[in-house]
């Protein structure tokens, strides 16, 4: 039943992308994904995670990165070149983060589509000053990655809804000329969590998006690309 449900979601995802409104945007040739464990996490035995893709999809092809890539491939008729990086260290220590040094490979990649999905590992933003500092760091991250090019930038809100973080991400996205993708409603559907699809020994892994949640994230990102 789960396999059938996922296949239905995948068909919907691909058809939605294939019927996106036509825009002047040329097909994306290079796509950069920056995120945390939801974007990519290597095997880690002590938390019972054996994958090397977005946690906690059941397979590489079912995480949001690969679903978005598949959707773009269907629309363009050719697969874009992709780069996927986990920047959880930026979330945890964004102040003074050496963007130019630590993310040199990502900058030199010169992506024409940049998708940023961060925030979940950020400590709580307890004051307006902390929120402003995070916003400033994310704005610097985005502008450095764009490096003066007219890249399309998507900034996704947190999967685990958090108003303070999401507001900072939205403002940073606007400051860098990006598009903010609000997925906060997904957190209210228990079916979007991996724990609803199969058992996990580690509660943290189980709290990540499962196949349904990953498909919903991908659908939101692809829909945002269809908006002028």
What residue spans do the PLM features occupy?
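Catalytic His-Asp segment of secreted/periplasmic serine-dependent ester chemistry enzymes
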Residues: 158-228
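Second-shell loop/turn segments in exported
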Residues: 51-59, 126-131, 155-159, 203-208
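Bacterial N-terminal signal peptides that target proteins for export
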Residues: 1-10
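Conserved SGNH/GDSL esterase-like catalytic core that processes O-acyl groups on lipids
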Residues: 27-32, 40-128
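Active-site segments of SGNH/GDSL-like serine hydrolases
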Residues: 115-123, 141-171
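Boundary at the C-terminal end of the N-terminal hydrophobic targeting segment
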Residues: 22-24
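Charged helix-capping and loop-helix junction motifs
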Residues: 99-100, 130-139
